[in-house]
Amino acid sequence: MFGGKGGLGNLMKQAQQMQEKMQKMQEEIAQLEVTGESGAGLVKVTINGAHNCRRVEIDPSLLEDDKEMLEDLVAAAFNDAARRIEETQKEKMASVSAGMQLPPGFKMPF
């Protein structure tokens, strides 16, 4: 099934290497900062890889406008930042498993 003992041992070695790479990648992702925008850049929200809000920037012109619109723009900017960090996480995690010769449908135990 795995090409003999060497095949299984090699597979386990690959799994361990992948686990180490994924742990390192998760640490790197936690340090990332991504900025989401709404209202053509009038509202900007910066979050880190753990989805913690680090900074909110609001163009002064919005402070004179409708409070409800401003709240919607802040929420939209946060959602944009969250989407961007998710995309970045997927890309980085995909790069960790690239090149590994795993059987189709193989699930990592971590």
From Swiss-Prot:
Keyword Endoplasmic reticulum: no
Domain of life: Bacteria
InterPro entries xrefs: YbaB-like_sf, YbaB/EbfC
Family note: Belongs to the YbaB/EbfC family.
Statement: the UniProt record of this protein carries the keyword Cytoplasm: yes
Subcellular localization, as worded in the UniProt entry: Cytoplasm, Nucleoid
Coiled-coil features, chain-numbered ranges: none
Any one cellular-component term (Gene Ontology): bacterial nucleoid
Function (record text): Binds to DNA and alters its conformation. May be involved in regulation of gene expression, nucleoid organization and DNA protection.
UniProt xrefs under SUPFAM superfamilies: YbaB-like
Subunit composition and interactions: Homodimer.
UniProt protein name: Nucleoid-associated protein KPN78578_04440
Pfam family for this entry, one: YbaB_DNA_bd
